[in-house]
Amino acid sequence: MDASSLFSIKGKIALVTGGGRGVGEMIAAGFVANGAKVYISSRDAAACEATAAALTAQGPGSCVAIPGDLSKYDDCIALAKEIESREGKLDILVNNSGATWGASLEEYPDAAWNKLLTLNVQRVFTLTQALLPALEKGAAASGSPSRVINVGSVNGIDVPVLPTFAYSASKAALHHLTRHLAGHVGKSITVNALALGPFRSKMMKATLDAFEDALAQSLPMKRIGRPEDVAAAAIWLSGPGGEWVTGTIVPVDGGATVYGEAKL
């Protein structure tokens, strides 16, 4: 029962969507550093390829870019087929692709709802559904469940102060979808979500540029999330030590859900 075996993901095949930068890159980097073969996909092909090359150079695992627009149904299906064609199975799926949209209540556009609910919820379902055969083959080959990790948000748990109406609603929906999926995939696949607090990413840039010091001081941990914080949580859920955890929403937030003033 040593830690190195409980949290080993060496040799695992993983797919991290939105893996070209931000939180997705943080998770992919953690996987590669611990010996996994990681596929990353995002709409920004240049960022995707650059990240894959950099992570492979760091090793000891490897990283492969498969660019695609994961807001589109056809691109999700094509990505799933490409993974099956290359590997025949999948051990870990991290659904991280997402977007946000902020505007006042009076000016909040209808387009925000279409964009965010499609990318943040519907396409998570689309891709997970399309990859079920590969995930089931991964479980059969390893003798342990394959893992699905959905990247949610503390905004899906507590009501945020900022006017990100469609975003917070989409993350609450994603958390509920996580639990619903976990109840349907049985013992061959676990499904969990990470409800993230503030991390340095493109999505959080404007907020952190304006409020980083105040936000950090409002958290019990008095700092913004670091790459190793989210990578460690994903590795835990992906390794043998996380095998009996499913249908759970795990806050990785420095205590953001504890204090009301820490809400974004």
Language model features: what each stretch is:
Residues D2-S5, I235, T246-L264:
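Short C-terminal tail/terminal secondary-structure segment
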Residues I13, G18-G22, D44:
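Conserved glycine-rich cofactor-binding loop
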Residues S104-L105, P109-L117, L215:
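Substrate-binding pocket helix/loop in short-chain dehydrogenase/reductase
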Residues T128, S170, T178:
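Active-site helix of classical SDR
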